[in-house]
C-alpha cells in the first residue's frame, strides 16, 4: 500500500490547518463507528487522510461539526 503524504491531501484541502481539522473530525467519526468511504484496514486517522487524498472527504467535514 502506498504511503499517504500531506501533499496528496493538500491538493484537496489547500490550508494545512483546515486539513488537520477535517482529518481529526473524520477520524473521530470513524472511531465512533461511521462507515469508511474507502476500503482500508488502517487506524481511523490514516483512513481519514486516505479519504481526503482520494477526494472522498473535503472541507464539508468542517461544516458538519457543531459550532
From Swiss-Prot:
Give the top-level enzyme category: transferase
Question: Which cysteines bridge via disulfide bonds?
Answer: none
Write down the InterPro entries for this protein, in alphabetical order. Answer: DNA-dir_RNA_pol_omega, Pol_omega/Rpo6/RPB6, RPB6/omega-like_sf
Q: What is this protein called?
A: DNA-directed RNA polymerase subunit omega
Function of the molecule: Promotes RNA polymerase assembly. Latches the N- and C-terminal regions of the beta' subunit thereby facilitating its interaction with the beta and alpha subunits.
Q: What is its EC number?
A: 2.7.7.6
Cite the record's note on assembly: The RNAP catalytic core consists of 2 alpha, 1 beta, 1 beta' and 1 omega subunit. When a sigma factor is associated with the core the holoenzyme is formed, which can initiate transcription.
What is a GO molecular function of this protein?
DNA binding
Family affiliation: Belongs to the RNA polymerase subunit omega family.
Entry annotated with the keyword Transferase: yes
Q: Spell out the HAMAP family in the cross-references.
A: RNApol_bact_RpoZ
Catalyses: RNA(n) + a ribonucleoside 5'-triphosphate = RNA(n+1) + diphosphate
Amino acid at each position: 500500500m502506498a504511503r499517504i503524504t500531506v501533499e496528496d491531501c493538500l491538493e484537496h484541502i489547500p490550508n494545512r490547518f483546515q486539513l488537520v481539522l477535517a482529518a481529526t473530525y473524520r477520524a473521530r467519526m470513524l472511531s465512533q463507528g461511521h462507515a469508511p468511504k474507502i476500503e482500508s484496514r488502517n487506524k481511523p486517522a490514516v483512513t481519514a487522510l486516505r479519504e481526503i487524498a482520494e477526494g472522498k472527504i473535503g472541507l464539508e467535514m468542517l461544516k458538519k461539526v457543531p459550532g
